[in-house]
């Protein structure tokens, strides 16, 4: 008996993806993305009609696996639920294939002809308002479903989680819905182990022709525990109202997935909304080909997993795809519901059984209550995808038709993933009449494009006038922190535009020079736009605060009045590394670039050309930092027009200027220590006119090739100037001059004007015309070539009277005042022996000369009114550190330097400042440092470098370790040399020690004696010690800590002897007083030792070796010594052999022993070569070093033995080196040599003491200290040890 139930009615909440169809149909096309942002995504975040918590799966995707997607309503309650359970026969054959429809479904699915649509369709038995549940959860094998086309409902739920489902094979399947007044949603669920799609699948299609009844909505859920795949020819089509839920470990769809298919012919204007939910896919989701739109404005949504890959994405010209990535941490599951699969509670079910068909019919309980639920209001904002969310699209393509629409069409791709990557396939925009636009936006993350941008499948493809093609990319729309990166060169044809909004935009290259009339709109970039190469021609560029590595302005076609226009305020942080204006042919084929406004533009290199213009008059300040020159100086036809407001020529920048430059400066001009090269054309130079003020800033830097101050203005080919004519170089309302080296500047300052005039130089080829410095006959020839005096060139000996003099060409006069800078050329004068205009050059007295050049200097002592500021007559060669002190008027400091730092300090300063840099750098350093500080720093540096070169320093760690071991070995020899006893034999002594003790029963008395009685005979010993040591020498200190271990024994045969061996490890560190030299070393020491007895005579022999690996660094804090900072490493090694003889004087039954001794020893010390890791010119280098030492020693030792095992000793002695030889290679810094000679033969005094106590049977504690003092160098060394010994 079936119990009927009244259907309850639930209105759809306004946040559903399916309901979005009705909403968006009334919204202009351009607002689709905004709708997803303001409605859909807030709904996903905020939860939906069921009242779920924010961020839960059920709240976000209740149309997903919980089957409530459509309109976010609860599933429609069926009138009847049919159940089919697969029998046990389906559980037995895992390799068998079944037809799912024929085997299980057909008994509860009816079919018939749809006259309205002229097609056959299928439905659940009894009508589309019923449900079929198929329980085959234990079934195995493969089940094919092929040809189930136009399944119109109701719900179908197939649970086959251990089997494989093949959809398609010989025919496809289509799942759709039955449109009635209740707007039912068809839900089809397949839960399998694997699902493969082998033929087409349609979701929510219209039956047959589609002319009849409409479809409502359909949800197809495919869930597979292992994987979901589709073949290359298997197309999945989603029509309006379709939802596809995919849940698996991985999804790979090789066939085309088509979202937004037309439901019937002519449905171009009908809205289409479809959804794919992959949020339950644990791994990657791979769409080989995804198509959105079928000549309609389809809107599609993908609820994505962390990683989504799309091979080719085809968007119709007005379609939109929204890919929503999960938030950080993923979606949270909603608590499990207590409702059953049919949507009713498990109690009060009425079930009728049909045993023959293995089918149950379950009727819902009586329930006449009607429930009205109002639409859910969701108020929340969008969310960002998690930091690992990625959407990868290899190729993005749009499709278009020839439809003309005002404003064109816009296709869109929107996501919130952390990273949206478009691969090497790039982007293609299909353009037609009225224009097309593609919008790619990432609301909260970054966009990366690795491939080219194409129009109509052509790189550099163009659009027709009035039908512009527009690319729009927006990164971080909501976060304002996204980065858009384009890793391929972008080439845009005519009327093709590019718009990018982001926090930062990075471009490899942009070429709009293929015809022009493009717009590059980067006004939405809030931080920086970085472009490696920008090629323009008639391009509108809207950008602020940019870095352009190279800007090339082309002159393509007739472009009068059409220039590249930077149409926005460029800000204060814009920079172009290189500007190149290409050459035009004539005025109508010209080009140019202009700027709307801006605070500052920095250009490193600027190359201008004829018929190409640069108009920066609306930029407040432009600075040229390296080069300002014509790109065609050898072919200067045509004209350029270069226009600036305020222009600065930066330090060391060079400007080439001629009448072809056509330079206009309407504001101020600052030459900040740059050089202006004036080119003589037709006997004239072009005047540089400055609209307001000019400032000529110069310094005292020296041209090392000539000895002159570096010129601020050069006139090349000055011999061609028209004679008897004033040639005005620069005019301004007011001109000021400044010497940055001395910190002086001013207007109408005669001294500064005279200094400036000596930095105005005239050249004939490379030879200076206005002044000649003659040091030899070659200088005479050069002077003759400069002034056109052939006699001086051919017969230089006739002009030897000029040698040692500076001669001034009085045929040239210079003017530098507050309004103009000019030269007047009368023609060259001729030097004569007594003609004057010369200044004697004094004899150089410096022995350590580096060059014969001379340097100009302010107020030189030889200067007179005829030649002010002309040539410096220094007492030292130019290029020496002394000459720099002279130029700074600090000659007296030279003596101070030698007095307090010596020749070595002077040579080090020469190396650091001049040999590794130049005189200008040296001048800067000494100007910033007092003489006292210079000598202090040099002394600290030479001390540190002497340590670096010293072999004693390199051996310090090994010697401290060896000293520690010498103390330990002496203690071991003292211990094993015991002759003191209580005059009873060993056996009796051991029995006496057990007196009064009781033991458990043992096998024999011998066992008692062995286990519990102490042993007094000299045993075999294993010993280990912790060691530490330190060395103090001239304000530096070294420390060591480590461990030593060994084994020894007393041999009592034909010969009484002690033999032993040891090994030790110690880590040593070193730092000098200034903490500028720091070292750390791992050291190892190993060897053998012995003592032979002949009555009271003792003969000692010892051999050992040591190896240390050192890592050192120089760390100077002062700017003066900063180039010395570097690190290096090397190996140190040593080998030692010792022999000594001593005689024992015994007292108190051998309890007290006094032993004098003498000995000799040999040491071989060495270190490997090294080179520091520095890349500077003062990289430290040192060759290998090796020394052989011979010494003798005399010692006295007192030993006191007490008890049966303990002792104490004192040892003192003197060691004298009597010979040494070897090599100590020189350490070097560039030209500076550090030859640290070894100290003279040394005398050492040594004292040590130690002893041992018994802690337990056969376990002993020993302690010792040693002190060694070098009586020559006053260096001190200290070491101690604490150790244990075990005898057996």
From Swiss-Prot:
Transmembrane segments: none annotated. Pfam families: VacA. Keywords: Cell outer membrane, Membrane, Periplasm, Secreted, Signal, Toxin, Transmembrane, Transmembrane beta strand, Virulence. GO terms for molecular function: toxin activity. Residues 1-33 form the signal peptide. One of its GO terms (cellular component) is periplasmic space. Coiled coil: none annotated. Residues 1015-1288 form the Autotransporter domain. SMART domains: Autotransporter. SUPFAM superfamilies: Autotransporter. Residues 326-377 are annotated as: Disordered. The keyword Iron-sulfur does not apply. Residues 352-376 have a biased composition (Polar residues). Induces vacuolation of eukaryotic cells. Causes ulceration and gastric lesions. The signal peptide, cleaved at the inner membrane, guides the autotransporter protein to the periplasmic space. Then, insertion of the C-terminal translocator domain in the outer membrane forms a hydrophilic pore for the translocation of the passenger domain to the bacterial cell surface, with subsequent cleavage. This is Vacuolating cytotoxin autotransporter. It comes from Helicobacter pylori (strain J99 / ATCC 700824) (Campylobacter pylori J99). The lineage of its organism: Bacteria, Pseudomonadati, Campylobacterota, Epsilonproteobacteria, Campylobacterales.
